[in-house]
Amino acid sequence: RLAVDPERFPDDNQEVMATKGMGAVYTTTADGRALRHPVSPEERTRLLDTYFHPYAKAFEDVVARILDRHGRCVILDGHSFSSTPLPYELDQQTERPHICLGTDNFHTPELLVRSIQALCVAQGLRVEQNRPFAGTYVPLRYWRTDPRVRSVMMEIRRDLYMDERTGAETPGLPRMRE
């Protein structure tokens, strides 16, 4: 994600995070500092053509193969998040869940959300939907057009398994692996 974020819309006019310098082509860091010099339209096109579009095409191809073979595809979009809000984040509330489930009204069935929530709650984890992050990745070829493609984003709060300052694993890591 230092150069390009393949989970963003390639058109900054469609991508809310572009206002934070974190659209398809990143121009700022998580703490709001400049990541690079201003990106020219030509350089942006080169970055998208070199990294974004090949990734998107490869992901689309995998989804197409799964659909051909099974008739449906479930994407589990895995991420982690800081225990305290970072400057770029739209949600600055300090009380954060253990698990964030990002959903899309078209691609995330309620049964999938309820099932994941139940598994997490049974482990004593606090789960919120679309908070502090919202949405989930679906290749643009299928986005809001093909109901056979299901997707949910699952974000795990980092302090549950690592020391956020050093990156060292903590005793909570085995529990999160489970």
Regions found by a protein language model. Give the residues of each.
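N-terminal catalytic or cofactor-binding beta/alpha core of small enzyme domains
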Residues: 1-178
